[in-house]
């Protein structure tokens, strides 16, 4: 059930082209962010930082392979090789870009609301940042996801917080729309 969002992040990981030993980061701690941590960890980074807005996501981030966790209001470094942004806000995109060293690679996967203030083009040019975007998953990303999952390097189950029978669809919708930070993915079983 969670391979589709994982495939979108596989597309981001492919575009990021993170090499073993590079310093990598993920901005965002939702489902996409946790998949990004797992994909980047599989590439043997020297350091894997996760930046989010909620302290309660640190344990899960570390479980998936993060070596450091910070909230975006803490002091953040500016010398990472690769950053994948998954939060879907303009401020997350700006935070992600600020984490990069000159010549670093940024992959944006989140979609901010219409009219959001974007990245500073002068900053992108002067710092020679390489910027990629992802929307959906092409066939190579799906293949990569299935291989990584089959190899045991991708674990979506900790992201599922509730499993309900299909007959409880309305309860599932209520849970998802509740805004409760303890509600992750809700899985309906037929």
Where are these regions (language model features)?
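C-terminal hydrophobic helical "lid"/dimerization subdomain
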Residues: 139-190
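Mid-domain Rossmann-like dinucleotide-binding core that forms the NAD(H)/NADP(H) cofactor-binding site
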Residues: 1-73
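N-terminal Rossmann-fold cofactor-binding loop
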Residues: 51-54, 86, 110, 135
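A short acidic, Gly/Pro-enriched loop at the edge of an enzyme's catalytic core
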Residues: 75-83
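Short conserved AdoMet
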Residues: 17-19, 88, 101-102, 154, ...
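Glycine-rich phosphate-binding loop and adjacent beta-alpha segment
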Residues: 90-151, 189-190
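A general structural signal for well-ordered alpha-helical segments in protein cores
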Residues: 6-9, 33, 80, 93, ...
């Amino acid at each position: 059930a969670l391979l589709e969002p994982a495939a979108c992040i596989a597309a981001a990981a492919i575009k990021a082209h993170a090499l073993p030993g590079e310093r990598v980061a993920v901005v965002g701690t939702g489902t996409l962010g946790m998949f990004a941590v797992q994909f980047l960890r599989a590439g043997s980074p020297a350091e894997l930082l996760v930046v989010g807005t909620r302290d309660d996501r640190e344990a899960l981030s570390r479980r998936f392979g993060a070596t450091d966790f910070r909230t975006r209001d803490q002091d953040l470094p500016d010398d990472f090789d690769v950053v994948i942004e998954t939060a879907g806000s303009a401020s997350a995109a700006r935070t992600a870009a600020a984490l990069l060293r000159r010549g670093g690679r940024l992959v944006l996967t989140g979609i901010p609301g219409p009219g959001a203030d974007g990245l500073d083009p002068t900053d992108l040019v002067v710092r020679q940042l390489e910027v990629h975007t992802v929307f959906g998953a092409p066939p190579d990303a799906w293949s990569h996801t299935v291989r990584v999952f089959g190899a045991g390097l991708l674990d979506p189950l900790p992201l599922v917080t509730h499993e309900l029978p299909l007959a409880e669809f309305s309860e599932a919708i209520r849970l998802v729309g509740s805004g409760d930070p303890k509600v992750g993915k809700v899985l309906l079983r037929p």
